[in-house]
Amino acid sequence: MNNIKDIWDAVLPPLPKPPLMTGTAQTMLSWPKVINSIDEIPDAFRTFFKTWLGDTQEFPHVILSPIKKGFFNTSSDKLICEMNDTIYVVEQFRDRIIANGYSPENIRDVEVGVVLLHGWITIKGINKEGVPAVSMFLFNSAQSEMFSSFITKIRSAPTKPDEAALNTERAKLDYLSQLDFKFMNYARSSLMGGEQVMHSVWQPEIHTTVGSVFGLSLTRTLSPAHLLLLTDKEMILIQDEPRSRGNKGVRYGGIRHYIPLRSVGAVSLAEQANDLIALSIHLSEDERVDSLFAASKEKEVLQLKTEIEKLIKE
């Protein structure tokens, strides 16, 4: 025996090594999961939930969104819950629990993004305390269907839509198949039962040339490909995520931004550099959603602006 380690190994048997966790198992730890009872609530939230639920007999619909490193940032453990017609997002901030509750009618807008396995939902509105609030949670998009009931609730969509009527409205978007098949599918699947398509404008990705190297032009993306879809109930903005990579000119995934018409205060149109025009959806005095279009789309965009103004005045 040449050293202390040899002596130690001879006296004591080696400790058993823990089983290695496969990459798949590690990935599954980041998946959201349905919580069925108070005993399944993570320790950090359990006392809060016991007090919060009180004598409630029926356990609410709760989903745990675990800590996840997202496409652009990292999210801590969060619980998403529906109770008494209210959507709650509960999270731990330092040593306290924060719960933002949103009634559907007080939600200003909601964004749903999916890029490969990275998914996120951002809710903006007035919480139950009457304070402006923003809640965001990340999730593995392989389990994105878990959150569909929350989006349905937020958008006040019927759980059992008239399929014949819905297919009639979806057919109005079939023209997109000749422009961008991915966006057609996104648009058709974004429609909810009971709403009517009023107008839509499609804009391919907009680039500008910033220089050249060895005779090859260098370009910069000014605006991702996007579609503005107006229904009689909401504005739906569907767009590529410009920071995502693509394959054969098609970027992976996309973002859907749902804005109920009650949240739209005004709409404006302005000329921009590079022969572009900007359509602005004003949600409040200091916040708006801007969409860039080529000047060649001006007639379509003007028609869209007129349709929006008519609907928000009704």
Positions of predicted regions on the chain:
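Long, mid-chain structured domain cores
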Residues: 94-99, 107-117
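Intrinsic disorder/low-complexity detector
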Residues: 1-74, 84, 112-227, 232-233, ...
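Extended, Lys/Arg-enriched charged tracts that mediate electrostatic binding to polyanionic substrates
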Residues: 90, 105
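N-terminal beta-strand/beta-hairpin edge segment
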Residues: 85, 91-93
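Short, glycine/acidic-rich beta->alpha junctions
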Residues: 102-104, 220
